[in-house]
């Protein structure tokens, strides 16, 4: 019966995956082929060039998406979860690499994650602009309004984020299915008129194009890469839908419809080279133009929503793994744990997208900024997957290299091709990536220095417990001390003794530990230890995708210790650390200032761990790093 249920839900899950996983790659036909014949390339629209570029597009889709991501990368899962942060956490756990060498792997993961943040800015801008630009095909009247309409759509999209997308999300899959079927039908209609375009499936057209235009190929590849945007999404969303529905949707709906549409656009160019102005919308019959513009706008909004949700999810993973400062995270759905809203990131993305639209003005101009982010992220994935295959699958090094080198070479060529556009827009993802990497690395290093200082300067907990005796006054109730260093006395406890001259009858030291897995089983959530008559140590283990609720976890811990649990009789003591600069080894002064600024603006511990505010006592302390 269970297998039957699974089979029954598989098509439904694949349909849901369409609206989340494939929105980005599904909107590429709006601009990708047009950019391949950009006037700056000086490439004539002759049949051999059209077939050559179409062949390159087809084989890039097959090699990068079908083989690399669908067949290989999606097997590198972290307890069912995918995405570059999950892969990094998995490699840090599995790979036998010296600690001083792990920094290089962390850096690669950080670069890939940072570029994905950049993708969250560029994708909504280029997608929505390219959809709205269809209005200029219908009439010139709309030309002055294209940018304002695009910005209005983007603003509306971000305004509704705080309300969640649980309700409208039900329609994303069906709408995206209609979109893909529309792509396929438009393509078939055009291919029937010019069937010679089907020669694109033969690799000899791609090889011939590369042979006759080696330098031009390099420039063209910078635009062809736009056809494989969103490959990372297949992997990143694997934990939400599972690999089988994603593969099913790709091979039976997405890939055929994309290929047919690119073939249809190519067939149109063979019939009418002037259609290069906008081959996607000129493929559409005049009577269907406005409905198609509406459909394209909905598809691009859905694609943008998927990327925004992906950025929120990635940020939460980075926060829980200790790579980003605590940010306020709101849950927008009672039934879907993954539906979250990060206010700070929401407004940051909105402002950045509007600035991007105002600077670049058209989707063609933005295409230069888009490609570099995509190719560098792919290259980071390839390197981390190679480490995974070597360490987790125990493949020999020659075998790993034989599998990975072809992808590495192809993606290195794509990186090189898109790097030529740094001055015309490629600087955008590089700038965003550099800022994000700096933040990630600075926060990670700052935390390491802070914890090292706490370990060094604070009393040993075991020594303190043995020596405390009756030298303090004991008061009724429970005191929970949140601490990141479980083997030393928390600053908050020392300050409580110093200022209040008391300790509670039960003093419970709680440390939250984030594991390198997405979820921790409930039975493995808690470890408890009785240190002495009045002292207990509790460790709460979470995965990097778990929702953290300390009061709920404490109930389980109290049961293990055989203690009576009453939240209204528990005081949570939290140390509010004030980080100050000190002379000596550590970070450069500007990084210390950045870390101190981030530390001061973190979300309160009580909010992050869902501790009732009226049960919290905050005590300040100063730490020099």
From Swiss-Prot:
It comes from Acinetobacter baumannii (strain AYE). It catalyses: K(+)(in) + H(+)(in) = K(+)(out) + H(+)(out). The chain crosses the membrane at residues 13-33, 53-73, 103-123, 141-161, 172-192, 206-226, 250-270, 282-302, 340-360, 369-389, 400-420, 422-442. GO terms for cellular component: plasma membrane. The lineage of its organism: Bacteria, Pseudomonadati, Pseudomonadota, Gammaproteobacteria, Moraxellales. Belongs to the HAK/KUP transporter (TC 2.A.72) family. The gene is kup. It is a multi-pass membrane protein. It comes from the Bacteria. Keywords: Cell inner membrane, Cell membrane, Ion transport, Membrane, Potassium, Potassium transport, Symport, Transmembrane, Transmembrane helix, Transport. It is found in: Cell inner membrane. This is Probable potassium transport system protein Kup. GO terms for molecular function: potassium ion transmembrane transporter activity; symporter activity. Transport of potassium into the cell. Likely operates as a K(+):H(+) symporter.
């Amino acid at each position: 019966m269970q297998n039957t249920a699974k089979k029954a839900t598989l098509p439904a899950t694949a349909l849901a995956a369409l609206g989340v996983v494939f929105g980005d790659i599904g909107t590429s036909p709006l601009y990708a082929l047009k950019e391949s014949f950009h006037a700056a390339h000086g490439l004539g629209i002759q049949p051999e060039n059209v077939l050559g570029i179409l062949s390159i597009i087809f084989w890039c889709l097959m090699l990068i998406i079908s083989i690399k991501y669908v067949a290989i990368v999606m097997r590198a899962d972290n307890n069912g979860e995918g995405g570059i942060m999950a892969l990094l956490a998995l490699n840090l756990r599995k790979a036998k690499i010296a600690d001083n060498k792990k920094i290089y792997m962390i850096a690669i993961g950080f670069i890939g994650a940072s570029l994905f943040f950049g993708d969250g800015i560029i994708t909504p801008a280029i997608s929505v602009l390219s959809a709205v630009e269809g209005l200029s095909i219908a009439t010139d009247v709309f030309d002055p309004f294209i940018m304002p309409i695009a910005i209005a759509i983007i603003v509306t999209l971000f305004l509704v984020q705080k309300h969640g997308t649980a309700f409208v999300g039900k329609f994303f899959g069906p709408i995206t299915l209609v979109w893909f079927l529309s792509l396929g039908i438009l393509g078939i209609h055009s291919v029937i008129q010019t069937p010679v375009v089907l020669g694109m499936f033969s690799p000899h057209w791609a090889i011939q194009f590369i042979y006759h235009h080696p330098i031009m190929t390099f420039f063209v590849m910078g635009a062809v890469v736009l056809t494989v945007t969103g490959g990372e999404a297949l992997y990143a969303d694997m934990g939400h839908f599972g690999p089988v529905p994603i593969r099913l949707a790709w091979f039976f709906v997405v890939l055929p419809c994309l290929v047919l549409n690119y073939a249809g656009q190519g067939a149109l160019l063979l019939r009418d080279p002037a259609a290069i102005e906008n081959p996607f919308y000129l493929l559409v019959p005049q009577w269907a133009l406005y409905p198609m513009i509406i459909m394209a706008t909905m598809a691009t909004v859905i694609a943008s929503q998927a990327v925004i949700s992906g950025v929120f999810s990635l940020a939460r993973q980075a926060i829980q793994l200790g790579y980003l400062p605590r940010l306020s995270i709101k849950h927008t759905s009672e039934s879907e744990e993954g539906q979250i809203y990060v206010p700070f990131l929401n407004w940051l993305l909105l402002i950045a997208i509007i600035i991007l639209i105002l600077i670049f003005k058209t989707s063609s101009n933005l295409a230069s900024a888009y490609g570099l982010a995509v190719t560098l992220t792919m290259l980071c994935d390839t390197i981390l997957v190679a480490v995974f295959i070597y360490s987790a699958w125990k493949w020999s090094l020659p075998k790993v290299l034989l599998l990975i080198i072809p992808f590495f070479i192809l993606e290195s060529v794509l990186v090189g091709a898109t790097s030529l556009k740094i001055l015309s827009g490629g600087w955008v993802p590089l700038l965003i990536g550099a800022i994000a990497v700096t933040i990630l690395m600075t926060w990670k290093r700052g935390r390491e220095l802070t914890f090292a200082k706490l370990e060094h300067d604070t009393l040993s907990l075991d020594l303190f417990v043995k020596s405390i005796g009756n030298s303090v006054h004991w008061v009724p109730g429970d005191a929970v001390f949140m601490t990141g260093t479980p083997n030393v006395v928390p600053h908050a406890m020392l300050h409580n003794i110093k200022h209040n001259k008391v300790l509670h009858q039960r003093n419970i030291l709680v440390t939250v530990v984030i594991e390198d897995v997405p979820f921790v089983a409930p039975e493995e959530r808690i470890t408890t230890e009785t240190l002495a008559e009045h002292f207990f140590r509790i460790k709460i283990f979470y995965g990097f995708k778990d929702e953290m609720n300390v009061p709920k976890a404490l109930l389980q811990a109290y049961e293990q210790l055989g203690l009576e649990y009453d939240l209204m009789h528990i005081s949570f003591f939290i140390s509010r650390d004030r980080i100050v600069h000190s002379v000596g080894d550590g970070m450069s002064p500007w990084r210390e200032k950045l870390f101190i600024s981030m530390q001061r603006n973190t979300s309160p511990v009580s909010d992050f761990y869902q501790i009732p505010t009226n049960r919290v006592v905050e005590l300040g302390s100063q730490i020099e790093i």
